[in-house]
Amino acid sequence: MDLWTAAQALILGIVEGLTEFLPISSTGHQIIVADLLDFGGERAMAFNIIIQLGAILAVVWEFRRKILDVVIGLPTQPKAQRFTINLLIAFLPAVVLGVIFADLIHAYLFNPITVATALVVGGLIMLWAERRQHQVHAETVDDITWKDALKVGCAQCLAMIPGTSRSGSTIIGGLLFGLSRKTATEFSFFLAMPTMVGAAVYSGYKYRHLFQPDDFPVFAIGFVTAFVFAMIAVKGLLKFIASHSYAAFAWYRIAFGLLILATWQFGWVDWTAAKP
């Protein structure tokens, strides 16, 4: 492993960790940054699976007490059972559509122009959602009904379009469906666990031939870096939303998306030549 490869792994691990749970699209940022770093091909596909696992481990650690309570209470406690059922209900729509459309979406939509467009559109929707009056009926994740869970799960399917953001879709969807800002954010984190682990297992098995022992040092750098920076991002977001809206993230999405589109329009960067 040379120094440049290690630097690529470090940078992409940081990008994954910081963006995975913020409503700004980690996949979109990965596509753009990986293209700028000229990090692509089969190794990149395997690398992305590993760093996503590093990011999800950060959420598991952050909410370990809640997870442990649910696991212990699952056999006897209705609250734990209801929470688990709601999580499964929210998880299923992405599973079904992911299996059907994943390859098609990866082939045609995994490019910086799609990402930039989705960033801008998603940012505008986020601003609109934040300015609407919301009638909140779920103040905690335990107040969520199965209908709420299904709606959030359907909203998560929009994140199959790169640049949309899985967390952005579920959080904003949650706000529109009557969840408090804190509840929508926490449920988005919990929903990320089965969704991302399921996607990683599916992709890991499908592309198992890409994992080579020589790449393990690169994977280790990305995994650890993604874990550390995801921890920072999760803690920071939970603290931020206690007193702020998501408007700042919406404006960031719009500005970043317009910047990418401008560099393409004026010919400064040939994004159309980018490969996933």
Curated annotation (Swiss-Prot):
Its annotated compartments are:
Cell inner membrane
Give the transmembrane region(s).
43-63, 85-105, 109-129, 184-204, 218-238, 254-274
Cite the InterPro entries for this sequence: UppP (IPR003824)
Listed Pfam families: BacA (PF02673)
Membrane topology term: Multi-pass membrane protein
Q: Which reaction does it catalyse?
A: di-trans,octa-cis-undecaprenyl diphosphate + H2O = di-trans,octa-cis-undecaprenyl phosphate + phosphate + H(+)
Family label: Belongs to the UppP family.
Misc. comment:
Bacitracin is thought to be involved in the inhibition of peptidoglycan synthesis by sequestering undecaprenyl diphosphate, thereby reducing the pool of lipid carrier available.
Function of the molecule: Catalyzes the dephosphorylation of undecaprenyl diphosphate (UPP). Confers resistance to bacitracin.
> By what name is this protein known?
Undecaprenyl-diphosphatase
